[in-house]
Amino acid sequence: PDPEGELRYVMDAVRLIKRELHGRVPLIGFAGSPWTLATYMIEGGGGDHDFKRTKQWVYSQPADVHKLLDIVTRSVISYLQAQRAAGVDALMVFDTWGGALAAGAYREFSLNYMDRIVKALGNEVPTILF
């Protein structure tokens, strides 16, 4: 999606909040991590967060999971770049469900994609991984 198109209301809100803050406090923009967003896409918003469907897909069709994560990563980068352009002072990526993965799977299916995000964003503003 085009952040200044379909999500223009978010960027307008960022610009308005930034203006109203008058530099008193930093404004932090944010997005979910590709892994976390993918789990919501696969599992839906409810459930007990055991991620059965997602884990089944990870282990049975890892190439397809990587395709999804690549698409989501590109969207997250675009969204965060737009927030930065709208005036945020820092960016945060929330990896809420990264802990659902074993260490090796975490590196492959979550950390790898957050690394791509950090590299794409550069160092114009701080980027926080949480």
Which sequence ranges carry the predicted segments?
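Active-site loop segments of alpha/beta catalytic cores
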Residues: 6-130
